[in-house]
Amino acid sequence: MDLTERHKRILKALVDEFIQENRPVGSKTLFDKHDIGLSPASIRTVLKDLEDFGYLASKHTSGGRIPTERGYRFYVDSLVILYELTLKEKQRIQQEYLKMQFKLDQILKATASVLSSLSNAAGIVIGPAKNLDTLKHIELIHVRGDEILMILVMRSGTVLHRNIFVDQNYSQEALYQVSKYLNDNLKGYDIYEIQNVIIPKLMIRKDGPEDFIRIADLISSAMTPDNSEVTLYIDGFKNLYANFRDEEQQLSQVLSLLDDQGFLKAFFSEYIDQDGVFTIIGKDGDRSMSGVSIITSNYKMGEKKIGALGIIGPQRMDYNRALPLVDFTSKLVSEMVTRISK
């Protein structure tokens, strides 16, 4: 059933009130504190409808109601009025970055701290996905008989080391020629493009050094990123203890979530390619996250989407401030990451 304007007005007022006070909301509270234009009896009727429709749940001990995940979902998608960050708030965020050198790891670590302190939740940032980071320089170095060290310098500033084992001895001069050929042809492409498009084309063209043709497959395979190399930055555990102090089960759930780095990397990586700000509420997520919400957005290097950031907190978080905070921060981080990559 579609909600009427009356239903929407009551639902918004109740969710706003619950986010603010963190206790079940009754008709008297809505009548006294919100300019709804209905009598307490009419409000009670609407609240009963919203409960029947699955947007609210009763707390029998108090007589009030709280939003369900469905209620939060409708609130975020259709009712929330986004707060516009003030110039002072934007400057405060920007000043956090002026305190440090412009290095990628410092920027991302500071971002987790900024998101946490301004949202009263946990801030989280996923470092650049290595297969989406673009190549700045490649060097092949002879280590010993059958071993070559491949050094990949990425545009983000990340340096990757790969050991390649070959079936014959290659001189350093031969590897220098291969390195030069690779730099001439691979620079500016990401690892996915290099592995799936560029190197196959170079092997067909056969205009490079013979030694490249012999070890091209080994070079391509060695570039495959390891998900463990993606760095995770988290800040704000104390906020979670404060937010969930009366809800031990949900606190345990969110702490378990933050402790599972493999899950977090995979979860946030799904949003790297998607533009916009996304809100995941409870079981919208890939596993049970009862009582938990995540707001996330990607960040870019130039036009290339390379990572994701966001906040994790209780479902009753202040969405009208949290959504624009994540949006502004993602754009600011994109600007800084692009600047240091040049």
From Swiss-Prot:
GO terms for molecular function: DNA binding. Negative regulator of class I heat shock genes (grpE-dnaK-dnaJ and groELS operons). Prevents heat-shock induction of these operons. Keywords: Repressor, Stress response, Transcription, Transcription regulation. It comes from Leptospira interrogans serogroup Icterohaemorrhagiae serovar Lai (strain 56601). One of its GO terms (biological process) is negative regulation of DNA-templated transcription. It comes from the Bacteria. The gene is hrcA. This is Heat-inducible transcription repressor HrcA. Pfam families: HrcA (PF01628). Gene3D superfamilies: 3.30.450.40, Heat-inducible transcription repressor hrca homolog, domain 3 (3.30.390.60), Winged helix-like DNA-binding domain superfamily/Winged helix DNA-binding domain (1.10.10.10). NCBIfam families: hrcA. SUPFAM superfamilies: GAF domain-like, Winged helix' DNA-binding domain. Belongs to the HrcA family.
